[in-house]
A protein has these predicted regions:
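Short hydrophobic/Thr-rich beta-strand motif most characteristic of the beta2 strand and flanking loop
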Residues: 24-32
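Acidic, metal-coordinating helix/loop segments flanking the phosphotransfer/catalytic sites
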Residues: 32-47
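Alpha4 helix (beta4-alpha4-beta5 surface) of REC/receiver domains from two-component response regulators
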Residues: 83-97
Length: 115
């Protein structure tokens, strides 16, 4: 599986890449939201993981472009601190396939990476 991770948090990147290594999933980590759609297409990503702790993400635009512009379905999972209720709600409204707290995400990241 190919996955793209959008996060500027090096600890998040490290943990997700470690989980990817265990599941033989290639993880392309990005810290620039402007590169997400292009990178998902380049690596033929099946999964996009979005860290909602990042500032200035136009998630509605990213989700819309990925859902409309690719022949391959990209599952979009957004995660963030449980105290950021507005960001979690906005991710749901934007059309993410799954939205979860950071704790839920890290508890299930290996399962997410195997499909």
């Amino acid at each position: 599986m190919q996955a793209v991770l959008l996060s500027a948090d090096l600890m998040v990147v490290s943990r997700v890449q470690g989980a990817g290594a265990k599941s033989s999933t290639a993880i392309r980590a990005l810290s620039n939201p402007a590169l997400v759609v292009e990178t998902c297409g380049e690596v033929e990503a099946e999964l996009l993981l979005v860290d909602l702790a990042m500032p200035s993400i136009d998630l509605e635009s990213i989700v819309g472009q990925l859902k409309a512009g690719t022949s391959r379905a990209v599952r979009i999972v957004a995660f963030g601190p449980h105290v950021h209720e507005d960001r979690l709600a906005a991710a749901r409204a934007a059309g993410c396939d799954a939205v979860m707290s950071r704790g839920q995400f890290f508890a299930s990241v290996e399962a997410l990476l195997v499909g």
